[in-house]
Amino acid sequence: MKTKSNLIIISIFLIDFFTKKWILNNYEIFDSIKIFPMIKITYIRNYGIALGLFQSYSNLIRILIIVISIFILLFIFYMKNLCKDLLSNLGYSIIIGGSFGNIFDRIFYGSVIDFIDIYIYKWHFPVFNFADISIFIGFLILIYNKKIFIVNT
């Protein structure tokens, strides 16, 4: 199970990495291109946390966000290693892969690269990326499996 979960983590990270690399190589900041009804590629940089909170804070706060993110990631690794069931392990692995992607961005780019822009009429989601989708799906799996931060004994 460990090899499969490592493969999931690495795959999620690489998909996230290469989609962001493609955005960096092909778009200018704030470029926005409609690709489907209700879906655009809009290249933005998120200097804050989820949903763009704390965007305008100092570099010290940004460093603190990285440190806190790493500690949360270590905790999720710990919880994953305590899990015995396949579905929970899958959920944690997907979360870890996505978390690595966003932490990588913060460390090497100084911000998270977001580009998936979904809107329905005037209702508009914050722009996000593949790592965010992965983290969300991982949490949905844990909630479905009723194992979020609960250890099987």
UniProtKB/Swiss-Prot annotation:
Q: Which GO terms describe its biological process?
A: proteolysis
Which species does the entry assign this protein to? Wigglesworthia glossinidia brevipalpis
Question: Where do transmembrane segments lie in this chain?
Answer: 7-27, 59-79, 93-113, 123-143
InterPro entries xref list: Peptidase_A8 (IPR001872)
**Catalysed reaction per UniProt?**
Release of signal peptides from bacterial membrane prolipoproteins. Hydrolyzes -Xaa-Yaa-Zaa-|-(S,diacylglyceryl)Cys-, in which Xaa is hydrophobic (preferably Leu), and Yaa (Ala or Ser) and Zaa (Gly or Ala) have small, neutral side chains
Gene Ontology CC entries for this record: plasma membrane
Q: Which Pfam families match?
A: Peptidase_A8
Q: What is this protein called?
A: Lipoprotein signal peptidase
Please state where this protein is localized. Cell membrane
In the UniProt entry, which residues are flagged as the active site? 114, 132
Q: Name one GO molecular function term.
A: aspartic-type endopeptidase activity
Q: What is its EC number?
A: 3.4.23.36
What HAMAP family does the record point to? LspA (MF_00161)
- PANTHER family xrefs: LIPOPROTEIN SIGNAL PEPTIDASE
> Coiled-coil regions in this chain?
none
In which broad location class does this protein mainly occur, judging by the first location in its UniProt entry? membrane
Question: What does the record give as its pathway?
Answer: Protein modification; lipoprotein biosynthesis (signal peptide cleavage)
Give the way it sits in the membrane.
Multi-pass membrane protein
For this chain, the family text in UniProt reads: Belongs to the peptidase A8 family.
PROSITE patterns, A to Z: SPASE_II
Q: What does this protein do?
A: This protein specifically catalyzes the removal of signal peptides from prolipoproteins.
Q: Which key words tag this protein in UniProt?
A: Aspartyl protease, Cell membrane, Hydrolase, Membrane, Protease, Transmembrane, Transmembrane helix
